[in-house]
C-alpha cells in the first residue's frame, strides 16, 4: 500500500500527512465527498510502528505495522468526530492487514 503525500511539492510536504488506500476506503465508508477537502489521512514518520488515522478535528484510529512495514492491525473509533461509518467499518478494514506500507511520491 503506497502512501501519497497530501501536500506533494508544496511547502507543507514535511508535515508527513499522507493519503492511501485505507484513507480512501474510510472516506467512502463515511460517505465523504471524494472531491471535498475534508478527508481522512495518516501521519507517517516511521518511528513507532503506528500510523495515526486522522481527519480534520481529531485522531480516529491507527494502522499498526511490524519492522518490515507489514500492516498487522487497523482500528477506527466509530464514536468520535465521524459518526457516519457503517457498524462493520473495522471488519471491512481488515482486508488491508498483511499489505506492505511504502512511501510514494
Report each predicted region and the residues it spans:
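Acidic, low-complexity, intrinsically disordered interaction modules
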Residues: 14-15, 26-91
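Short, low-complexity, charged amphipathic interaction modules
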Residues: 90-103
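Short N-terminal leader segment in a subset of presequences, especially plant chloroplast
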Residues: 7-15
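Structural detector for short beta-strands of small beta-barrel domains
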Residues: 5-8, 20, 24
